[in-house]
C-alpha cells in the first residue's frame, strides 16, 4: 500500500476527526452512492465519473478528492452487500440530512448527478436513476419553497 493510499485510508476512516467539513463530504458521498449503487451491473464507469466530479468540486485538494471517492465506495459496498443499508434507507438518510442541515440543498448538483447516466446500460438502472433524480429535484424545490 502506497503512502498516499495509506493516508487516504486513514483520513477516510477518521474523517470525523481529521477532515474539515466532513459532514458535507459525507453528504455528497451519499448522493453519489445512490446513483452508483443503482447500477447493479458494473460500477467501473461510475467511479471514473465520480473521480472527475470530485476533482471539479475539490480542485486543489487531492486528499479530499480521494476521501470523497473512498467514502462513496464504502456506501456503495454497504448497499451492494446489503449490509444494513439499501438505496431506500440511504435516500431517507439524505432526506434527514437535508432537514438537519438546510445548506446541504446547495450541495446537490443535478448536472453532476446526471453525469452517471453516461454509464448505464439497462432499462432498470435508467428508471431507478431517473426516480432518484426526481426525488432530489423534489427535495431541492421543496426546500427552496419552504426557505
Regions found by a protein language model. Name each.
Residues 1-34, 41-147:
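Small-residue-enriched hydrophobic alpha-helices in membranes
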Amino acid at each position: 500500500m502506497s503512502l498516499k493510499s495509506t493516508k487516504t485510508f486513514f483520513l477516510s476512516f477518521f474523517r470525523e476527526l481529521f477532515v474539515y467539513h466532513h459532514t458535507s463530504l459525507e453528504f455528497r458521498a451519499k448522493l453519489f452512492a445512490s446513483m452508483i449503487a443503482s447500477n447493479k451491473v458494473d460500477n467501473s464507469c461510475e467511479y471514473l465519473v465520480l473521480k472527475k466530479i470530485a476533482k471539479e468540486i475539490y480542485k486543489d485538494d487531492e486528499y479530499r478528492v480521494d476521501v470523497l471517492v473512498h467514502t462513496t465506495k464504502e456506501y456503495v459496498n454497504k448497499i451492494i452487500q446489503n449490509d444494513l443499508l439499501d438505496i431506500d434507507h440511504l435516500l431517507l438518510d439524505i432526506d434527514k440530512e437535508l432537514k438537519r442541515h438546510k445548506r446541504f440543498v446547495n450541495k446537490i448538483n443535478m448536472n453532476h448527478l446526471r453525469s452517471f447516466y453516461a454509464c448505464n446500460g439497462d432499462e432498470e438502472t435508467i428508471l431507478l436513476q431517473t426516480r432518484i433524480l426526481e426525488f432530489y429535484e423534489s427535495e431541492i424545490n421543496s426546500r427552496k419553497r419552504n426557505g
